[in-house]
Every structure is written in structure tokens, then in C-alpha cells.
Amino acid sequence: MREPALAASAMAYHPFHAPRPADFPMSAFLAAAQPSFFPALALPPGALAKPLPDPGLAGAAAAAAAAAAAAEAGLHVSALGPHPPAAHLRSLKSLEPEDEVEDDPKVTLEAKELWDQFHKLGTEMVITKSGRRMFPPFKVRVSGLDKKAKYILLMDIVAADDCRYKFHNSRWMVAGKADPEMPKRMYIHPDSPATGEQWMAKPVAFHKLKLTNNISDKHGFTILNSMHKYQPRFHIVRANDILKLPYSTFRTYVFPETDFIAVTAYQNDKITQLKIDNNPFAKGFRDTGNGRREKRKQLTLPSLRLYEEHCKPERDGAESDASSCDPPPAREPPTSPGAAPSPLRLHRARAEEKSCAADSDPEPERLSEERAGAPLGRSPAPDSASPTRLTEPERARERRSPERGKEPAESGGDGPFGLRSLEKERAEARRKDEGRKEAAEGKEQGLAPLVVQTDSASPLGAGHLPGLAFSSHLHGQQFFGPLGAGQPLFLHPGQFTMGPGAFSAMGMGHLLASVAGGGNGGGGGPGTAAGLDAGGLGPAASAASTAAPFPFHLSQHMLASQGIPMPTFGGLFPYPYTYMAAAAAAASALPATSAAAAAAAAAGSLSRSPFLGSARPRLRFSPYQIPVTIPPSTSLLTTGLASEGSKAAGGNSREPSPLPELALRKVGAPSRGALSPSGSAKEAANELQSIQRLVSGLESQRALSPGRESPK
């Protein structure tokens, strides 16, 4: 750090011409070497000498004057903080002695009472390698200065005695002789020089002064020894330039209550407490550990506990309601197959919901429990007038179904289709009759109109679905045929309900077909539903066999009728959905779209769909994967339904079929093999046609259903 000083010394001996001002003053070199500080810089003789106009006398006079000034002052000047720009040229007048000014400065210590409190206990100041500010900060108020004269205010810290200290028995005592002193540094107030009027206008604070124990510090911090006592000193110098400090008159003021012992960690707990009580930045010593953020967190914890305690009984009540008050899904009144088209009947579901009075939060869990246990033990009765009526043994089985639905993995001992053999013969006999009934019932069964439910509470019916999965086939297609008028369709995060028969009418069959992806053949009846349950997923394959509303929880999504690229399954669920709810949602999306069609769906095709058990990579809801694959690239126009239809008729087939149920889901037919391949392709291509054309396409093709449904 002495190179700039040597350069400046050489300039001091350079002959200056009288008419020309000084080329570069001393401060220019110092600023170039250290922009903000003058760290421990001992100015050499001649560096601060005033240039003389006579070139011949410049060398000797400068050397003599500088030597005398340095001997008198004996100061090592250091500056911390910004000072006026020094690169500009200065005239010689800036270094001329000032006229005599009459002043009588008076200095008072700010926050004297706080200093006294610390002083009584023995003030401690922490020093660190990176530098630490003082607390209380050294702040004084000055009066009696000349308003027009310029003053430089400085501060330094000197050793108070020649001793080293230690804290023992709750008090400070001398521990030995002091260590060698560190380099002395003076802290020049950043506002210096300034007029007396400016200094007297407000307290003069040296709060930016930092203490360090780093001997090689290059930031201009004051270097101190730990466990030594120090005394701050305040200086007033009347000068209009910092370079005049060495030969200016210093007025020094000492406040005994400001002495302190430098420490690397606080020794006296009382001092620590005083700092905590008075210093808003003493975050490292608070009880909370790390300052205001943790303190704020601690303050919020009681309110969080109160909130949790307040919500706990509600959650407990909701869980008990979900387990005890929810009606079994099959108790919902089914729509008569021969009834005329009518809106969805939600009165019983709403009444049961009001009686339960459950909170809306556990709805996904309640839906999953209902739908997971709904199909277990259900099989359509032979009675043609009411195909979904249950016998008493089946009702008894259904009462036990929620418990079985909650634990799908525990029932896996019989294999994915382990329970099918118990009901196989009876279900196959029923299917032959049901296939004939469906052709006649499909003509009588109308299509239930679309009902948008605006009630915030959701009816907990068997056909409920916590989310609808849209496949990648929908990119660029219209969402709903009847609603495709070019306007966006905004769905409330509550329920969007429609009758099960409305899907084929609205061109929604391709949605369900693409969700289904493919299907296995297999025996019908409750055995297959339980078999899928044993496969690790709580299914609700026959959940929509009644005319219960079909809700879509499309929360936080705006679906435009022009068609928005939809994510695959799970993307439209409310975020915290369970695996059980997702599986039930998939199963609820699969059933055929009329009440009579759903009866046969309960018997066979839907509950055996490999959609729930397949290892389809993009369906992330299945925690238990069965090695049955479905090509994700399967197209809606895939043909080959003739061979797949024969597979669908086979009761024990577990082979994947690309799209045997495609057209069936699309047009609303309930059973496999109901359509010819050409009919399926035609309906897939014309999926957005009117309701009449779709229904009329069924009438000519359902005659094939009984023959192809028979097991091989």
C-alpha cells in the first residue's frame, strides 16, 4: 500500500510552476489505490507538503515542512467510507491556511443512559473476522461550531490500559499484560468535510464503524485485540481538506462510559440481555434462534394449534359421517328401463346428504370408499323390469363391501379373477337373456337430458366421479357436441352432472372409449368386480348402473368448446386425490350410457376392463400394476373388432384387446360384441352426429348381441 504514497512523494519534489495549479493532489493517488478507505497508511515526509511556486526552493522547503508536520502530528491516516471525488484538479488555495475562526465546540453523548447501563455491567463489543458494528452506536451531538467554517469529524479507538482481561465469577478481572497493539486506524466520518451548520443540524453518528480482529484487514475496519479494554475518542478538526489533518489542531473528546472490552463472544449474560432488549438487530441471541422470521413463526404456532384443535372434531365428525351415514350406492332408486326420458332424480341423494351433514373436505375419500365397495357382490337380477334390484344375500354382501373396498390389496389371494368362478355359471346364464332384453329396452329407454347442478353440495350417488380423464385423442376436437357453439364452456369446481344416457347423445362416447383403451372378456357378475378388487384396485365398475348423476370435478380448469389439449388421467382431478378415488373415477367413466345398458355392464364387460389393472404408463393412479399392456398409440379408428369381440365373449381371457369396447362406449351399447367392425368404425368417424343417428345405428346392430355374448 505504500506505492501510491511514494509516487506522491516524488511529486512533492517536482518543480511546480506558479501560474498553474497542482496537477494531482495527494488524495487522487490515495483514491486510485483505495477508492473508499485509507487503511493504515503512514504518509511519508513530503507527501502532504504544499508545493512552492519557486522551482529552486521546492525540494528543500517541501522536505523540511513535511518532516515538521509529520513529527508534530504522528498520525496514520485512514478513511472509511466515501469522500469527495479527488480526481478533479484543485487549486493551491485549497491548501492555504484558513483565517482564524472563533468557535467553542461542545459535544454531548447521545443515548447516555443506555451507555451508563452497559458501563455498570461492563460493556462488551463483539469483534469478528468480517467486522462487527458497535452497539450502542457511538453517536454525539455537537454545538458551538462556526456555521461557515468547515470541519472534519473523526473517531478512533485506543487501548484504555495495559492489561488483558478475563471474565471470572461473573466479573471481569485482569488476566495479564496486554498483547502488542494493533495498527492504529482513524475513522473519518463519511460527511467530512462539512460546515459547522451541517454538523450541528443533527446528531453525528458513527454507526458504520466496524470492529475486527483480522490483522490483515483491507476494509479499513478498526483492528482490536480480544479480551482487551478500549476507549473510543471523538475528534473535531477545523479544516477544509482531509490532507490538512496532519498539521491541523485536534479537539479530542472522551466519554468514560463508552469504554468496552472487545470479545469474540459475549461473556456476561446480563450484557447479552441488554443487547437483546435494545438492539433490533441482535437476532443471533434471541430465544427463537434466528431473528424475526423464526420469531414470527413461533408467534403463529399457537394460532395454528388452535386452528387444528378446532378443525379436529370437524374432521372426526366428517370421517364418522362418511363411514356411518353414507348410504350404500345401490340404495339409490334406479330409473325404470321402460320409463320415458326424465331429468336426473337427485332428491334422495340430497336428502341423504343432508342427514349425514358431512363436511365437503372428505368428499374424495367418501366417493372412493363408496365406489370402491359398490360393485362387490352386485349382479343384475333376472327380473327384467328392474335389472339392478338386489337380492337379500347380495344386500348383505354390499354392506360389507366398503370395508373390502378400502383394503383392495388384502383380497388378492385369489388372483385378479379369483372370485369369478363362484358366480360364473349363474352370470353366463343371465347374460344370454340380458342381451335380448337390451335390444328392446334400448328402444324404450330415452336419453336423459343434461342437468347442470348448481347446488354446491354434491349428491353422493353411485355414479359419482371425482374427475374425468381426457386422453390425447381429444386435441382439436369439440368438448361437447350440443354445446359446441364456439363459446368456452366454464365448469364450476362443484359438480357438473349429467345422466348416464347423455354421453352417446353428446358425442362423448369417444371420451369414454379412449379412457377405457381396451378390454378383456370375462365372466360377468359380482365375481369379476371382486376379482378386480383383488387385483389391487378398488373398482366401481357397475357404479353407474343406476340413473345417478354423473359429476365431473373439473376444478380450476376452463374447458373451451373448441377443444383444449387435455392431460391424461389424473390431470383434472382435484389435487389431493387418492389412488382409490382415481380407480373409482376410472371405473365410473367406463359404464355404458343408459340405465338398461348399465345393467349388463355390471354383469360383465365394464368390471373386467383392463383399464384398471393394466400397466399403462401414462395412467399414474394405479399403485399395483398387472402386466397387461395397452398400446398408448391405439387409434379410435382401430379395426379388428371381430377377433376382439370373440375374445370378449371368452370368460377367462386376460389378453389385451386394443379397442373392443370403443364403439360400445361411444354409442351407448352395454355389452361387448354388440357391433360389427364396420359399424364401430363408422360410429367412431361420425361420433359428433346427432342423437337420432347414433341411436338408430344401434337398432340394427344389437340383434347380434346375444349370439356373440355367449361364452366359448
Curated annotation (Swiss-Prot):
Biased composition range(s): Pro residues: 326-336
Any single GO BP term: mesenchymal cell proliferation involved in lung development
Residues within the DNA-binding region(s): 109-287
Location relative to the cell: Nucleus
Compositionally biased residues, Basic and acidic residues: 363-372, 391-409, 421-444
Record keywords: Developmental protein, Disease variant, DNA-binding, Nucleus, Phosphoprotein, Transcription, Transcription regulation
Pfam family, one: TBX2-3_RD
Gene Ontology, cellular component aspect: chromatin; cytoplasm; nucleoplasm; nucleus; transcription regulator complex
CDD domains: T-box_TBX2_3-like (cd20188)
Domain of life: Eukaryota
Function: Transcription factor which acts as a transcriptional repressor. May also function as a transcriptional activator. Binds to the palindromic T site 5'-TTCACACCTAGGTGTGAA-3' DNA sequence, or a half-site, which are present in the regulatory region of several genes. Required for cardiac atrioventricular canal formation. May cooperate with NKX2.5 to negatively modulate expression of NPPA/ANF in the atrioventricular canal. May play a role as a positive regulator of TGFB2 expression, perhaps acting in concert with GATA4 in the developing outflow tract myocardium.
Known disease link: Vertebral anomalies and variable endocrine and T-cell dysfunction: An autosomal dominant syndrome characterized by skeletal malformations primarily involving the vertebrae, immunodeficiency, endocrine abnormalities such as hypoparathyroidism and growth hormone deficiency, craniofacial dysmorphism, congenital cardiac anomalies consisting of double-outlet right ventricle, pulmonary valve stenosis and atrial septal defect, and developmental impairments.
UniProt name for this protein: T-box transcription factor TBX2
Organism: Homo sapiens
